[in-house]
């Protein structure tokens, strides 16, 4: 083709689509963001009819052209793509326009291909499928011919285009018929009428697919006609006609421009590239262009092949990770995929024998359903979790007005209805035939979730009752045990039954019948009530046996003894006059205290019948029973039960401790009598008054003493009145502290001086004598 810097071969002679088309677009537009602001134009016509020459003159492209002086032969092979932003107009030969991509299609009816019309048909169909404007280039003398003006080819192209793209009713293509070498003898209007009549006749004879029976040519195409003078004989007029044609392409005024919004595919360049490639692949693999009507013997093979292609298309477009939280989104996507697949199948397979076509269609639908079930199951798993979480949330919300069993029934029905509605949406849209397995699985999961929440609610109710019973025991029964009477256990059991009854009152249905409102049967409710009473008796057992230990029993006896010993029947403190009175009170108080020892040691009613729980008790640790026989470390068996509180040895030790403390109390009482009987006699005070009267009168009669006494009294009064004791005491303390510090320092100085004198004395030199000198002096003296 010569220089091809500004054009690439979009489809080569081997019918292969150029994979570097997108890079070519990027090279053309560079860094500009073109978006959808571009147009695509194709030219179609007989070989050597001047198509490339027209494009070069009109759009300033550089497509190779034929040198007629040398030889008339095929110049354009395949489909070539060029780019321009300049167009020839009457005003300017280089008028700037939007990006135009021009397709130069290999000419039809060429000697090189002979009777092989497969490529020219596919090329024409491809040009119609991807272009906004298709220029049909023909000579004036070809008008009225059937083969010469490509009407037979246009019929085939129209038919296949209608079957493949008939559903795109919102898209049109402009067919611009350019009549070349128009000498003006036959008016353009006459040529236009002839061509329109031929096109309408072709359209009416088409085998239209379902849904397009009543469609017309103008539903899919707009028709425009123009004429160009002879390029060689009338070159100036030819260029003028070309520029007039350029005005229509460059104009942006509605009604005058060749471009309309409905012509555009509304795809960015990269999207258009993909679209063009897909269109060519679809056209290239559409074997119906070259095959006659299929026989019934091959119908099954063809429909199966088309079915596999349709399923492959679905799998190709199926998202790898399809996660939709909304039902409408998922259903819409799946419905779109199914429609795409079945439409692909129906488009091609419906042309074959209907029974075979329908059988394979049902098989294809079943395969689609199996694929959809995988995605729907994942979606339903997410919805199950959400619904079960909502059930749990509804059941955990506190509501005093609505019983739990009512909430559970309502929540279960709400969740089950919501899930069934989800399933109904999928089946109603015919995405799947049935989802009974998923429905059954959700019902089981829902029952399990409700059962779990029921157990939790029951556990909370039992714990709440146990806490209420435990609180009542600690408050009410503690007081009874701390202040025991002979009918202690009658009162304890009465209070205990009252506490249990109050705690379970809201669940009582009838006498000895209870409903814990979690959906249990009558028998199960009775078992729960038995468990509640067992917990209550266990709490009472642990509290009684924990409180009435040996030390606490001694304290209770001591308190009971002291209340009787120290206070009279009017709760007034006793004033002892003699030891006999103390001894009598001691005897009575001791008997009063010890009379409840048996009561505190053994739990029995006023009829002396041991108290036995009406349900078995357990400690909660491996169901260890709190009652019955047990073996101690020495291998001796003992009876363990609710009524047995203190053993005989514990009672004996408690009595000994109590007597020891009671004796101490008596001794203190007797000592108080001794202190009151050894006080100073009254006559001593009388003697002090008589003998000291004179001294008292001396003080009273001395004015100095009286004045000093008055001053001190007045001073003390005002100090007290003004609340000055604190400052005075602080001042006195400060003065005393300073005095002490000063005296301490003086004493330290004196001691330091004495120490220094002693040191100096010890350091004075002393006269030393040798033993020989002493001997000499001794001898001298003797002589």
Swiss-Prot record:
Residues in GB1/RHD3-type G domain copies: 35-265
Lumenal side: 701-703
Topology, Cytoplasmic side: 1-679, 725-783
One annotated GO biological process: endoplasmic reticulum membrane fusion
GO cellular component: endoplasmic reticulum membrane
Name this protein carries in UniProt: Protein SEY1
Gene3D superfamilies (UniProt xref): P-loop containing nucleotide triphosphate hydrolases
Key words of the record: Endoplasmic reticulum, GTP-binding, Hydrolase, Membrane, Nucleotide-binding, Transmembrane, Transmembrane helix
Gene name of the record: SEY1
Keyword Isomerase listed: no
EC annotation from Swiss-Prot or TrEMBL: 3.6.5.-
Residue numbers binding GTP: 45-52
Known role: Cooperates with the reticulon proteins and tubule-shaping DP1 family proteins to generate and maintain the structure of the tubular endoplasmic reticulum network. Has GTPase activity, which is required for its function in ER organization.
Keyword Iron-sulfur belongs to the record: no
TM region(s), chain numbering: 680-700, 704-724
Disulfide bridge map: none
């Amino acid at each position: 083709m010569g220089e091809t810097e500004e054009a690439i071969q979009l489809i080569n002679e081997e019918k292969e689509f150029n994979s570097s088309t997108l890079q070519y677009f990027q090279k053309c537009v560079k860094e500009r963001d073109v978006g959808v602001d571009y147009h695509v134009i194709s030219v179609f016509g007989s070989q050597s009819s001047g198509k490339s020459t027209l494009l070069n003159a009109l759009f300033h492209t550089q497509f190779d052209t034929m040198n007629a002086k040398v030889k008339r032969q095929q110049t354009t092979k395949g489909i070539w793509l060029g780019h321009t932003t300049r167009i020839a107009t009457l005003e300017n030969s280089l008028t700037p326009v939007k990006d135009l991509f021009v397709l130069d299609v290999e000419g039809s009816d060429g000697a090189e291909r002979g009777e092989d019309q497969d490529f020219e048909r596919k090329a024409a169909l491809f040009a119609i499928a991807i272009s906004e404007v298709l220029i049909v280039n023909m000579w004036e003398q070809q008008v009225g011919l059937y083969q010469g003006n490509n009407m037979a080819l246009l019929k085939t192209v129209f038919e296949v285009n209608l079957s493949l793209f008939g559903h795109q009713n919102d898209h049109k293509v402009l067919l611009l018929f350019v009549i070349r070498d128009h000498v003006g003898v036959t008016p353009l209007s006459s040529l236009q009428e002839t061509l329109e009549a031929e096109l309408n006749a072709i359209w009416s004879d088409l085998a239209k697919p379902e849904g397009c029976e009543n469609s017309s040519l103008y539903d899919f195409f707009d028709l425009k006609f123009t004429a160009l003078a002879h390029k060689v004989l009338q070159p100036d007029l030819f260029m003028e006609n070309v520029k007039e044609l350029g005005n229509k392409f460059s104009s942006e005024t509605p009604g005058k421009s060749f471009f309309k919004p409905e012509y555009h595919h509304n795809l960015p360049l990269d999207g258009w590239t993909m679209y063009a490639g897909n269109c060519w692949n679809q056209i290239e693999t559409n074997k119906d262009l070259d095959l006659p009507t299929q026989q019934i013997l091959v119908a099954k093979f063809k429909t199966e092949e088309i079915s596999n292609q349709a399923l492959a298309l679905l799998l190709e477009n199926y998202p790898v990770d399809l996660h939709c939280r909304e039902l409408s989104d998922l259903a819409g996507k799946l419905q779109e995929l199914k429609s795409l697949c079945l439409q692909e199948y129906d488009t091609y397979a419906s042309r074959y024998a209907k029974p075979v076509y329908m059988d394979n269609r049902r098989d294809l639908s079943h395969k689609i359903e199996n694929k959809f079930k995988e995605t729907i199951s994942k979606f339903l798993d997410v919805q199950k979790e959400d619904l079960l979480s909502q059930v749990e949330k509804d059941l955990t919300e506190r509501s005093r007005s609505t019983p739990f069993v009512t909430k559970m029934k309502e929540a279960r029905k709400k969740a089950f209805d919501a899930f069934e509605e989800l399933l109904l949406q999928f089946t109603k849209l015919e995405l799947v035939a049935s989802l009974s397995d998923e429905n059954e699985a959700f019902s089981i999961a829902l029952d399990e979730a409700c059962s779990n929440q029921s157990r939790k609610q029951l556990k909370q109710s039992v714990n709440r009752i146990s806490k209420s019973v435990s609180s009542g025991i600690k408050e009410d029964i503690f007081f009874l045990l701390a202040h025991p009477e002979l009918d202690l256990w009658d009162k304890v059991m009465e209070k205990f039954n009252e506490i249990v009854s109050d705690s379970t009152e809201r669940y009582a249905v009838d006498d000895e019948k209870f409903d814990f409102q979690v959906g249990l049967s009558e028998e199960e409710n009775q078992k729960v009530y038995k468990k509640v009473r067992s917990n209550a008796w266990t709490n009472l057992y642990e509290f009684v046996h924990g409180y009435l230990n040996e030390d606490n029993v001694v304290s209770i006896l001591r308190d009971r003894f002291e209340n009787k010993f120290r206070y009279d029947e009017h709760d007034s403190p006793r004033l002892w006059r003699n030891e006999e009175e103390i001894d009598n009170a001691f005897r009575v108080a001791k008997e009063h205290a010890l009379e409840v020892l048996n009561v505190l040691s053994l739990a029995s009613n006023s009829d002396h019948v041991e108290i036995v729980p009406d349900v078995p008790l357990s400690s909660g640790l491996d169901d260890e029973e709190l009652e019955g026989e047990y073996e101690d470390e020495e291998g001796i068996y003992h009876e363990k039960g609710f009524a047995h509180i203190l053993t005989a040895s514990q009672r004996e030790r408690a009595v000994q401790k109590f007597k020891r403390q009671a004796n101490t109390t008596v001794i203190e009482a007797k000592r108080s009598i001794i202190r009151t009987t050894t006080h100073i006699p009254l006559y001593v005070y009388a003697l002090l008054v008589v003998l000291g009267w004179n001294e008292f009168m001396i003080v009273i009669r001395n004015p100095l003493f009286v004045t000093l006494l008055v001053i001190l009294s007045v001073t003390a009064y005002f100090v007290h009145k003004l609340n000055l004791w604190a400052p005075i005491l602080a001042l006195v303390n400060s003065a005393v502290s300073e005095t002490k510090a000063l005296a301490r320092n003086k004493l330290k100085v004196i001691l330091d001086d004495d120490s220094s004198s002693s040191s100096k004395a010890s350091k004075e030199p002393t006269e030393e004598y040798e033993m020989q000198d002493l001997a000499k002096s001794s001898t001298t003296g003797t002589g």
